[in-house]
Regions:
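ATP-dependent NMP and nucleoside kinases share a basic, alpha-helical "lid"
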Residues: 91-146
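Short hydrophobic/aromatic beta-strand immediately N-terminal to the Walker A/P-loop
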Residues: 3-5
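Conserved nucleotide-sensing/catalytic segment adjacent to the nucleotide-binding pocket
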Residues: 30-33, 39-87
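Conserved lysine of the Walker
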Residues: 14
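P-loop/Walker A phosphate-binding loop and immediately adjacent motor/lid segment at beta-alpha junctions
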Residues: 49-50, 66, 78-79, 86-90, ...
């Protein structure tokens, strides 16, 4: 099993790189998005959720992510959380069953900030893009996918 880590700033093109690798390896890839491992904020007030810094490593449940990567390496399937940016919470009723595969791609803006996660990766890629291009992609994505406004 090969574990590839793909990191980069918001809107840098990580998803595009993941899609390109997946297309080349045709069905031999499992994708683990860092976004699924955001800590649940359902206990927080609306203001606390708005103020939460999703770009800080403490916002990620790296313990669970690393534990599940290890289980996949051992050939076991895992139940990946489902996180909603709209509610800032993990689904209490649903998970995604993730099965081991020849290649596992872990992608996200913060995945290289955790030493234990880095140690589990065989290949690490950092995706970079122009700041203005990234900003436009992030604004577009946040409005379309995450229910945010331009304000």
């Amino acid at each position: 099993m090969l574990i590839i880590g793909i990191a980069g700033g918001s809107g840098s093109g990580k998803t595009t790189v993941v899609k390109a690798i997946t297309e080349q390896l045709k069905g031999k890839v499992t994708i683990i998005p860092q976004d699924a491992y955001y800590k649940d904020l359902s206990h927080c007030t609306a203001q606390e959720k708005r103020d939460h810094n999703f770009d800080h490593p403490d916002s990620i449940d790296f313990e669970l992510l690393c534990e599940q990567l290890q289980q996949l390496k051992e050939g076991k399937s895992v139940e990946q959380p489902i996180y909603s940016y709209v509610t800032c919470a993990r689904s209490k009723d649903e998970t995604v069953t993730v099965h081991p595969s020849e290649v596992i791609i872990v992608e996200g803006i913060l995945i290289f900030t955790c030493e234990k996660a880095r140690e589990q990766m065989d290949i690490k890629l950092f995706v970079d893009a122009d700041d203005d291009d990234r900003l436009m992609r992030v604004i577009s994505r946040d409005i379309i996918e995450r229910g945010k406004t331009v304000d």
